[in-house]
């Protein structure tokens, strides 16, 4: 399969999905959402895929929503989203995380760099989250005056506890990878050059 916003590589029964918009720090847009959903649909049907690793190309995992289109950022056309305007649902990250939650095989997120907004919240639907020492995480929705997206108000308290989830979302602060490990947002921390090999192992 070919995708515009990601790479899809299967080797030794492991599918590696690489978010591939490095010029924008892999910022999330509707093309990426559609590509990710199609990738998980394809992997669910492929008996050769036993597990999935999701990572980012370049120095970032995902910089959050791509806001470069201004007011049209969340106003997709039929051609780019595949639905009529009347059928449009606003939380693109939520549609993605619910698809991942229904996925039949293990999903490992290997966070290689900064992950903010939907870049952080999409990882909550994974089964395992590991990160490089270069990773940072931010549930920054309060900074924009919006509620947390991608079902993170359900996932995050189950992972880090209600008090820490509230503190992270109320403050909107960015946390370093060592703090993410301390609060069990990730399960292990790795040298950047070892991240993918460790994820595979």
Q: Where on the chain are the PLM-derived regions?
A:
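Charged catalytic carboxylate motif
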Residues: 31, 35, 92, 99, ...
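Hydrophobic/aromatic residues within transmembrane alpha-helices
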Residues: 17, 54, 66, 122-124, ...
